[in-house]
């Protein structure tokens, strides 16, 4: 185990991870759900050699998918419970520029909140900058532009599309996981 805590506070439920070009990583800590309560989550940045971890965003409700824009200037976070996608401008190593309250819930720009009964899960960013988010209940992948517009919804038979990543030599093949 590389990290178990940050500043004396235990990690509760690390979930998704994205590496930057320097080999450092950002990750979501979703927390835990119990019968009558749910933890507030956090976003962390860490060095892959185990020497430094920073809590970057806290509190944030059910942070799940995480990704970086192709130029690594924007950090994307998918909020599961609300089905929202946020973008945070990266201002330095392990730092984001936060939009002040009341203009933002968590400090990020709300990019997409289409509404309806859906939840966002994991995400991957295309080479062109579009954010592809596994979408629960509606069963598909929501393709969202960097400005927040829904470009396309790719429907699958399974209602629980939980993860997506790109692979193959040209990184144009999408691999998804479904869990229903």
Language-model regions, residue ranges each:
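Beta-rich, blade/repeat-based domains predominating
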Residues: 7-25, 30, 42, 53-74, ...
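C-terminal closing repeat unit and adjoining cap/tail of repeat-based domains
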Residues: 137-180
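Short loop/turn segments immediately following beta-strands, especially the blade-tip
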Residues: 87-100
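Short, solvent-exposed loop/turn segments at conserved positions within beta-propeller repeat blades
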Residues: 31-41, 80-83, 136-137
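A short loop-to-beta-strand structural motif that recurs across blades of beta-propeller domains
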Residues: 1, 41-44, 84-86, 140-142
């Amino acid at each position: 185990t590389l990290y178990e805590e940050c500043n004396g506070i235990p990690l509760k439920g690390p979930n998704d991870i994205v590496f930057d070009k320097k080999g450092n990583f950002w990750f979501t800590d979703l927390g835990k759900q119990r019968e009558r309560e749910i933890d507030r989550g956090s976003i962390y940045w860490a060095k892959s050699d185990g020497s430094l971890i920073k809590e970057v965003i806290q509190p944030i409700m059910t942070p799940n998918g995480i990704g970086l824009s192709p130029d690594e200037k924007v950090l994307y976070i998918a909020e599961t419970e609300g089905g929202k996608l946020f973008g945070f401008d990266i201002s330095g190593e392990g730092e984001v520029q936060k939009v002040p309250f009341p203009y933002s819930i968590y400090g990020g720009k709300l990019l997409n909140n289409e509404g309806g009964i859906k939840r966002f899960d994991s995400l991957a960013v295309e080479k062109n900058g579009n954010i592809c988010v596994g979408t629960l209940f509606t069963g598909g992948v929501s393709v969202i532009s960097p400005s927040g517009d829904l470009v396309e919804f790719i429907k699958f038979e399974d209602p629980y599309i939980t993860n997506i990543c790109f692979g193959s030599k040209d990184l144009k093949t999408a691999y998804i996981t479904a869990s229903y």
